[in-house]
Amino acid sequence: MDPALRSYHQRLRLYTPVAMGINLAASSQPLDPEGPIAVTPRPPIRPSSGKAPHPEAPRRSPNWATAGEVDVGDELIAISDERGPPRHDRPPLATSTAPSPHPRPPGYTAVVSPMALQAVDAPSLFVAWLAARWLRGASGLGAVLCGIAWYVTSIARGA
C-alpha cells in the first residue's frame, strides 16, 4: 500500500468516534417505527429533452406526490400525466431511414456472436471445470492444477 495512503488510513482510524471513546449508539435517539415518514421536498421533474410539457397536459396533476407518504407508482402516474398523450406522428420505437454514417462490413449481422468473449471465457471455464473436479474429490492434483490454471489465466481475467 502507498505510504501516504497508509498514513491517511491510520489518521482516519485514529480520529473516528469509536477510537476517541464516543459511543454513538448510546447518544442516538431510539428509532420510532410509528413515527412520520420524512420526505424531503424536491423540484418538479422536467422532461430530459428540455422541451416544454405537452400543451394538452394539465399543469398540475392531482396525483402529484406531496410531502406526505410518497409512492413510486403515484409519481410515475404524475409524470405520465404531465408529459401528456404519446405523439402519433411516428410509431413507437421507429428507427430513422437515413443511412448509417458507419457502414457495416459485409456479412455483418446484428446478433452478437458468442465468439467475442470466447478468449476470456475459455480459460475461466477450464478453471471452473478443474474446481468442479477437485470438489468432487478426484484427488489433490486437481487442486494444484486449479491453482496453476488460476494463476496462468489471471491476465485474461484482468486480475
From Swiss-Prot:
It is found in: Host nucleus, Host nucleolus. It comes from the Viruses. Changing residue 149 to V: In strain: Nonneuroinvasive mutant HF10. Residues 80-91 have a biased composition (Basic and acidic residues). Residues 27-107 are annotated as: Disordered. Changing residue 122 to T: In strain: Nonneuroinvasive mutant HF10. GO terms for cellular component: host cell nucleolus. Phosphorylated. Keywords: Host nucleus, Phosphoprotein. Belongs to the HHV-1 US8.5 protein family. This is Protein US8.5. It comes from Human herpesvirus 1 (strain 17). The lineage of its organism: Viruses, Duplodnaviria, Heunggongvirae, Peploviricota, Herviviricetes.
